[in-house]
Amino acid sequence: MHKLVRAVRFSVNPFLPVGTTGFNSYASKPCGEGLSFYLNLWVEVVGGLEVDTGFVVNVSLIDRIVRRFVVSIFDECIKKSFDRGEHVSLLEICEVLRRAWRVLGDKFGSAKLSKLRLQLNPFRTVAIESGDIEVFYFSEKFEFAAMHTLWNDKFSKEKNFEVFGKCANPAGHGHNYVVGVTVQRPDGDDGFRIVDFEKVVDAEFISLVDHKNLNVDVP
C-alpha cells in the first residue's frame, strides 16, 4: 500500500455574491477577490499503484474532484454564517469536513480516503481520519529559542569539530525551534477552546524551554 497526500488551495469571499474561479491553483482556486478566506485542504489517500501509470491517484483528479464537490460545501457554510453574523466553531468546521468526507469517499477508484486535514492558517490545522471520523485532531505549531552545548572535554579540539561540526562550541550555541502539538478530541466536545490549549502548552512546555540553556536549565 502507498500513501498520497495532495494539498488543494482555495478561497471563499463572503462579501461578494458570486466568486471568481481564477487561473492560479498554486495561490488558490477559486482565487478570491480582495479580502477572502484562504483555506488549504490536504487530502490523503492510500492504495496500490496503477499498473499503467505508477500512480496511486492522478493528483489532477484530486484537484478536480475537490474543487467540483467540496469547495462549494465550505463556500456555503462560510457565506451562510457570514450572512447571519454567526461564529463558525471548530465543531462546525469538523462537521463540514465530515460532509466533505462523505462526498469524497467513493471518488478515487480503488484508493481509499484516509485523512482530511484543513489548514486554517500556516500554523493551525484540524483533521479527521478514516479510523473514526467522529474524532477530530487539532494541531498548532509553536516557536521557541534555546541554546545547548555540543562539546566533549574528553575530545581534542579537532575531534570535537570532527564529531559536532560547526555546532562544536564549549560556550554553547542556540537555535530557533518549531514544535507541533496535536490533541485528539471527540465529536461534540464543545468545551475545547484554542486559547486554553495554547495556555496549557505555554505553561507546561514553552515556558520551560524558551530562552533557556537546555543543558543547565531543563532537568
What are these regions (language model features)?
Residues 1-219:
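Charge-rich, low-complexity N-terminal segments
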